[in-house]
Swiss-Prot record:
Interacts with tim and per; promoted by light conditions. It is found in: Cytoplasm; Cytoplasm, Perinuclear region; Nucleus. It comes from Aedes aegypti. Blue light-dependent regulator that is the input of the circadian feedback loop. Has no photolyase activity for cyclobutane pyrimidine dimers or 6-4 photoproducts. Regulation of expression by light suggests a role in photoreception for locomotor activity rhythms. Functions, together with per, as a transcriptional repressor required for the oscillation of peripheral circadian clocks and for the correct specification of clock cells. Genes directly activated by the transcription factors Clock (Clk) and cycle (cyc) are repressed by cry. The lineage of its organism: Eukaryota, Metazoa, Ecdysozoa, Arthropoda, Hexapoda. This is Cryptochrome-1. Keywords: Biological rhythms, Chromophore, Cytoplasm, FAD, Flavoprotein, Nucleotide-binding, Nucleus, Photoreceptor protein, Receptor, Repressor, Sensory transduction, Transcription, Transcription regulation. GO terms for cellular component: cytoplasm; nucleus; perinuclear region of cytoplasm. FAD-binding region regulates cry stability, cry-tim interaction, and circadian photosensitivity.
Length: 545
């Protein structure tokens, strides 16, 4: 007898370390039953972040699905990709294919709860076993909350203490064996009804999504898929090993470079092309290997994968908070009276037309590539919110969620709340603020990054490339870049705006403190060092704001 099981891919777009895949390959019977597997993905307008998605994100997703399809075809199967409401598609598959079991990876964020509750209800109604497995996070966020007494840990140090009680995250599960698995096929009439797609032929344009970057900019190309992710992991581990041998860790933060091919694994983690548990354990095992050959062992702990732990923290903080990416209904977010722009201020920030080269280069890189270094994300977010324009972080979240390859709801919103001093910060303490001009001089001393993404400034002398408005008019004419015509003049007096915003923050803070008990349960960092590590704040790029 053969049982029919569905493996529903959502975010975990991989075959390695995939507990839900292993579950789908189990027959749950007497042992004489074989398994017929149907691997599927559903374009329902929301799953995998497709509710708000730009060209590069959709391209990365389609490449990831095509890579899965290619791998499955090599072993006799394929990835069935459908378009439509997930419940409606599943109901027809259950009815026509006599499905015994549905398996999928847990999507812990509350934005997926209604979808998954509806699917689980359908499974109960149609007597289909529904199995959900945790593998998109290192730990189960629900277990973290239970261990912390039923509430999320309100500081990062509390989070570290809680997961220390739980213990180290599970190691990756075994590789799947398809030796005794049959892959099912979809009847043609059903395929037409549930809008079966040929994923190998899909492009962002098929979804009405078009490239918005400057095609003349020379930019990095990112490629989605498990195959590419595992290849990149090998390169990244070499970089990690060099850092460990050199006595430091987090190499992409310790020595940030904006022009070299990026080695970040975050996009692959966001779409689940790479298992976060595999990445975590590869780095930690490598560290132990390097340390075993050292005469004096250096403590590493969770710090060597600090960004992965922050990812877990933000996931945990969001899991019971459906308003996590909003301000007013969000219990952990301070309600700051942000400016509601009636002019083109927000559009100028989005399009890279602020008149501040480092900000503009970053925003144009985002449109061109779907990527920004962690430092550039922080500085552009600070500029939009408390550092300059005083526009709500909610607008920034929506823009980043649409265009950043690796943006997911929890981490993206958490970062924006922190940077804007709305949460995860000392109560409205706006003292730690990066100067985009000082940071540009520090990290792009020759202006190479700015010139790549702002070709109109390519001929300006290095002396003026980060402050083109200071170039004499004859220099501007000679370089073919007149400020105010070929490149915008600064849209604001940055120093004055920063001071005014800091004063406003202090005033709001004072009123909140005077109210005492009405102050929201505001999450905040454990110490000053945590702030500097999060923002990457050398002394010489901190502005007086």
């Amino acid at each position: 007898m053969t049982v029919n099981n569905i493996l529903w891919f959502r975010h975990g777009l991989r075959l390695h370390d995939n507990p839900s895949l292993l579950e789908a390959l189990r027959n749950d019977g007497t042992g004489s039953e074989s398994v017929r597997l149907y691997p599927i993905f559903i374009f329902d307008g929301e799953s995998a972040g497709t509710k708000l998605v730009g060209f590069n994100r959709m391209k990365f997703l389609l490449e990831s699905l095509a890579d899965l399809d290619r791998q499955l075809r090599e072993i006799g199967g394929q990835l069935y990709v459908f378009k439509g409401n997930a419940v409606n598609v599943m109901r027809r598959l259950f009815e026509e294919l006599n499905i015994r079991k549905l398996c999928f990876e847990q999507d812990c964020e509350p934005i997926w709860k209604a979808r998954d509750d509806a699917i689980q209800n359908l499974c109960r109604m149609m007597d289909v076993k529904c199995v959900e497995k945790v593998s998109h996070t290192l730990w189960d966020p629900q277990q973290i909350i239970r261990t912390n007494g039923g509430i999320p840990p309100l500081t990062y140090q509390m989070f570290l203490h809680t997961v220390d009680i739980i213990g180290k995250p599970p190691r990756p599960v075994a590789a799947p064996s398809f030796e005794f698995v049959e892959f099912g096929s979809i009847p043609s009439i059903l395929a037409q009804e549930v809008k079966l797609q040929q994923v190998r032929n899909l492009s962002p344009e098929d979804f009405g999504i078009y490239y918005e970057g400057n095609p003349d900019i020379s930019h990095q190309q990112w490629m989605g898929g498990e195959t590419k992710a595992l290849e990149c992991l090998g390169h990244r581990l070499k970089q990690e090993e060099e850092a460990f041998l050199g006595g430091y860790f987090l190499p992409t933060q310790a020595k940030p470079e904006f022009l070299v091919p990026p080695t970040s694994m975050s996009a692959a983690l966001r779409f689940g092309c790479l298992s976060v548990r595999m990445f975590y354990w590869c780095v930690h095992d490598l560290y132990e290997k390097v340390q075993a050959n050292n005469q004096y062992r250096n403590p590493g702990g969770q710090h060597i994968t600090g960004q992965l732990i922050w990812r877990e923290y933000f996931y945990t903080m969001s899991v019971h908070n459906p308003h996590y990416a909003e301000m007013e209904a969000n219990p952990i977010c301070l309600n700051i009276p942000w400016y509601e722009p009636k002019d083109d201020s927000l559009d100028r920030w989005k399009e890279g037309r602020t008149g501040f080269p480092m900000i503009d280069a970053a925003m144009r890189q985002l449109l061109a590539e779907g990527w920004l270094h962690h430092i550039l994300r922080n500085i552009t977010a600070t500029f939009l919110t408390r550092g300059a324009l005083w526009i709500s972080w909610e607008a920034g979240v929506q823009h980043f969620l649409k265009y950043l390859l690796d943006a997911d709801w929890s981490v993206c919103a958490g970062n924006w709340m922190w940077v804007s001093s709305s949460a995860f910060e000392k109560l409205l303490d706006s003292s730690s603020c990066t100067s985009p001009i000082a940071l540009a001089r520090r990290l792009d001393p020759k202006g190479e990054y700015v010139r790549r993404y702002l070709p109109e400034l390519k001929n300006l002398p290095t002396l003026y490339v980060h402050e083109p408005w200071k170039a004499p008019l004859d220099v501007q004419k000679e370089c073919g870049c007149i400020v105010g015509r070929d490149y915008p003049a600064p849209m604001i007096d940055l120093a004055a705006a920063s001071r005014a915003n800091a004063n406003t923050m202090n005033s709001i803070r004072q009123k909140l403190m005077e109210r005492g008990g009405s102050t929201p349960p505001h999450c905040r960092p454990s110490d000053v060092e945590e702030i500097r590590n999060f923002f990457w704040l050398p002394e010489d790029v901190v502005a007086d704001c």
